[in-house]
Amino acid sequence: MTDIIRQLEAEQAAKIEEKRKLPDFQPGDTVRVQVRVTEGTRTRVQAYEGVCIARSGAGLNENFTVRKISYGEGVERVFPVYSPIVEGVELVRRGKVRRAKLYYLRGLTGKAARIAEKKDNRTKAEREADKAAAAKAEAAKAAAE
C-alpha cells in the first residue's frame, strides 16, 4: 500500500518539476522565494529573501524554512516545496555551514548571525563530475605514455 502512495507522490512531484525547476539549495543558502499573494481578487508575485535554516519532509510533503530580519524583527516562513503558491526559488548565495538545522540563528543578532559564503559555488554533483573528468583525462594521459 505504501509503495503505491510513494509511486503516486513521485509521479506528482515529477509533473510539478516539469513546470518549474527549483535550484539545488540547502540550509545556510540565501534564497529569494517568489510567492504568489492573493489580495482580494488580484494576485501578484512577491519576493521573500532570507536564509534557508531548515529542510524537512520527503516527497510531496517536503518543505523548507526561510528566515529574514524585517524592521529589526526575525521573521520565519515555511514553504512547501511543491506548493502552487511558490512560483520559484532563486539562489542568491551559498552559505558555509556544518549543520542541517540552523535554529541557533534565532538567538543570534547582528554580525553573529552572519553565515560565511561558500567559496566553491558548484553543487556536489558538479564537483564529482569534474573530479571524474580529471581522473579520466589522467588515465588517458597515462595510457598514451
Swiss-Prot record:
Domain of life: Bacteria
InterPro entries per record: Ribosomal_bL19 (IPR001857), Ribosomal_bL19_CS (IPR018257), Ribosomal_bL19_sf (IPR038657), Translation_prot_SH3-like_sf (IPR008991)
One BP annotation, GO: translation
GO annotations of cellular component type: cytosolic large ribosomal subunit
An example Gene Ontology molecular-function term: structural constituent of ribosome
PROSITE patterns hit by this protein: RIBOSOMAL_L19 (PS01015)
SUPFAM superfamilies referenced in this protein's UniProt entry, alphabetically: Translation proteins SH3-like domain
Protein keywords: Ribonucleoprotein, Ribosomal protein
Entry keyword annotation includes Hydrolase: no
Annotated Gene3D superfamilies: 2.30.30.790
NCBIfam families tied to this protein: rplS_bact
Protein family per UniProt: Belongs to the bacterial ribosomal protein bL19 family.
Function: This protein is located at the 30S-50S ribosomal subunit interface and may play a role in the structure and function of the aminoacyl-tRNA binding site.
This protein's name: Large ribosomal subunit protein bL19
Lineage: Bacteria, Pseudomonadati, Pseudomonadota, Alphaproteobacteria, Hyphomicrobiales
